């Protein structure tokens, strides 16, 4: 795995592939960032953005955001091994001052410190609790006016976002479906 663009382009990312984590493939990540850069329907700026990387695993999405100029990325994950790799990556890439590691379940975090521009959610494909987490994030109003939600799901998933999200776009890459949305 590697950083695809920005100031750290080409740098290698350590990763961990277990049953509990499945890193976002480089090709899928590259397509997400191409859409962020070139889509007419998505108008969120990555430069100086506050990004919340939820179910972050080793944090490949958030690391990419930091390489491309994001101001701050909290990474939320509960898997100890994934967090160890993430911490190592942040130190090796010398971007740890722009990151916060939160070892907790999203539903246990009752108060967030900031409002965010970009939310990235990559929950386990079988986990449906993430929809309740989305509702809670929406209710806490921790999103800026200019925001975007990006969700990585299995391509055949049938998630119900009614009343929570306005879907802007969906793209399928192999087994993955990427959803671009806004809070309603």
What are these regions (language model features)?
Residues 1-184:
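Class I S-adenosyl-L-methionine-dependent methyltransferase catalytic core
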